[in-house]
Regions:
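Mobile genetic element proteins and their domesticated derivatives, centered on retroelements
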Residues: 20, 63, 97, 117, ...
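Extended, low-complexity cationic-aromatic segments
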Residues: 1-99
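Short, basic/hydrophobic alpha-helical segments
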Residues: 91-113
Length: 208
């Protein structure tokens, strides 16, 4: 399916996107390496949480890495991000899928090959039902973007090419000797990935 969707004649209407979620910590320091002077070495200063801090210690984020070009030389230089007030759950997943479909429709796409892992908020009944009903609506109305989910093998997150993007991103947005607010961190992440910073998706009550 991936090879078929990557063919030039399909690229006009098909989108290929690898979806994943990640937590961005305001306090945890990533493992990083850099060239530095022996006279003035660079140190990362670990910050401590304070009770008066109104922001969350970490931000949950949904992301899609879009792929175009042939499968033997894929181009993966575009990302879509959306932060969450809370944690990834099925309700937020469907919201993010809807946002992505709206964006793809504006680009003239009619189908999305969605590649992701087997997280509970991906395989839940709520999400499977939403995708099925969404596709029926697209077929009935003749408008919108169909979603074709393709699951990665279980316990193989490294097969998702978005994973290295997260790792490098965490190294690049770190504040060496200070503490960013949640909004500052989110804005810095969006700037790094060349994405616009949008309002956070909100988790509704009593959903999972």
């Amino acid at each position: 399916m991936l090879t078929w969707a990557s063919q030039e004649r399909q690229a006009q209407t098909w989108a290929i996107g690898f979806l994943d979620e990640v937590w961005w910590s305001r306090f945890a320091l990533p493992r990083a390496h850099t060239w530095q002077s022996t006279d003035d070495p660079l140190h990362l200063v670990e910050q401590a949480w304070q009770k008066a801090d109104p922001d969350a210690k970490a931000l949950a984020c949904y992301g899609v890495l879009w792929q175009r070009g042939p499968t033997d030389a894929p181009i993966r230089d575009q990302m879509s991000l959306r932060f969450v007030d809370g944690r990834p759950v099925s309700d937020i997943t469907t919201q993010f899928l809807d946002v992505c479909c709206t964006t793809l429709q504006a680009q003239g796409k009619t189908a999305w090959l969605l590649i992701w892992d087997n997280a509970s908020w991906h395989v839940s009944k709520r999400v499977r039902t939403w995708i099925r009903e969404h596709n029926v609506q697209v077929k009935t109305s003749g408008k919108g973007v169909r979603i074709l989910p393709l699951f990665l093998p279980k316990q193989s997150p490294w097969l998702n090419p978005i994973e290295p993007k997260w790792i490098h991103g965490k190294r690049c947005v770190i504040e060496p000797n200070g503490l960013l607010t949640a909004k500052q961190l989110a804005q810095r992440i969006c700037a790094y990935f060349h994405c616009s910073y949008e309002a956070h998706l909100t988790i509704q009550e009593n959903v999972s």
